[in-house]
């Protein structure tokens, strides 16, 4: 009996992780649509712009200051930041919840971003700080098992 219960628990945990990664693929695909609009404003080179679609891959380094500027611009398109360029918790919760099954990811995503923001709060340049927060979030999301595979993003990108 205990063995069956353990297997059921493992299946639920795996389903939950896959579910949150799937939601993250929707969030990433939708959020990424604003990148082209923000390219000129942020000074993002065409090379980095092209690489951004691989944000979640191991090969993509989240290091360029211009990427931080682009993320600020993109976030502002969806009202996800406060005036001090820190996460707007309520708006981010609402944004993530707007996707299918978003409620399973919302709190975890906001918490991870907020914890990363605290680590880099002393950086005064907004673009530098935001790119550090994004890199931290990518690492932590992978640790938590909520980072989507690139194929998952490609599968849903046409919806947005």
From Swiss-Prot:
State the signal peptide span.
1-19
What is this protein's function? Present in the aqueous fluid surrounding olfactory sensory dendrites and are thought to aid in the capture and transport of hydrophobic odorants into and through this fluid.
Tissues expressed in: Antenna.
GO terms, molecular function? odorant binding
Pfam families per the UniProt record, alphabetical: PBP_GOBP (PF01395)
Record has Protein biosynthesis as a keyword: no
> Any keyword Zinc-finger?
no
Q: Name the family.
A: Belongs to the PBP/GOBP family.
Name it.
General odorant-binding protein 2
The disulfide bridges present are 38-73, 69-127, 116-136
Task: Provide one Gene Ontology biological process annotation.
Answer: sensory perception of smell
Q: Which domain of life is it from?
A: Eukaryota
Per UniProt, the keywords (alphabetical) are:
Disulfide bond, Olfaction, Sensory transduction, Signal, Transport
Q: Which CDD domains match?
A: PBP_GOBP
List, alphabetically, the InterPro entries matched. Odorant/phero-bd_Lep, PBP/GOBP, PBP_GOBP_sf
